[in-house]
Amino acid sequence: MPSRKSLLSACLAMLTAACATVPDALPPLELAPHVDLHRFMGDWYVIASIPTIFEDGVHNAKDTYELMPDGTIATTFTFNADAPDGPIKHYKSVGFVLAPDSNAVWGQQYLWPFKADYRISYVSPDYDVTVIARAKRDHVWIMARSPSMSDAQLARLTAFVAAQGYDTTKLKRVPQHVIP
């Protein structure tokens, strides 16, 4: 019968080997050179995304950012669940700027102590459209200040997302219904 010490050593060796086996590293994401946080604040409508499991079936999705006095960013994700007139849902989180030289890399905290990777990969000069990405290339959001975007502009941003290493066949258009 193996001793506790040998079992612990074997487990430690397997854990070390698992950590040492890293898949091919992805190249760094392109980031917005500088994000003016005051201009970035406000409402952003999600036009298309490679969604998280929590975003399946959303309509009228919108992120709202508010810069707080302590430098954190209060974030509210609002949407209608499962239908254009479905129940309104809200998720709140707190953003933390992790790269103050550019303000383009944030940690987004939905549950303490975990911070999700959140990178402003692109923001237009007029702060009208943005692309939010993640280093893992698992999720991405194309957002705009208004709930609509031309097909040509969406195609340009989709090409940008593809150039960042994303599988754009997973990109889904988010239904935005303007309700008077």
Where are these predicted regions, by residue range?
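Bacterial N-terminal signal peptides that target proteins for export
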Residues: 1-8
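Bacterial N-terminal signal peptides
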Residues: 9-17
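A beta-rich soluble binding module of mature secreted/lumenal proteins
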Residues: 19-180
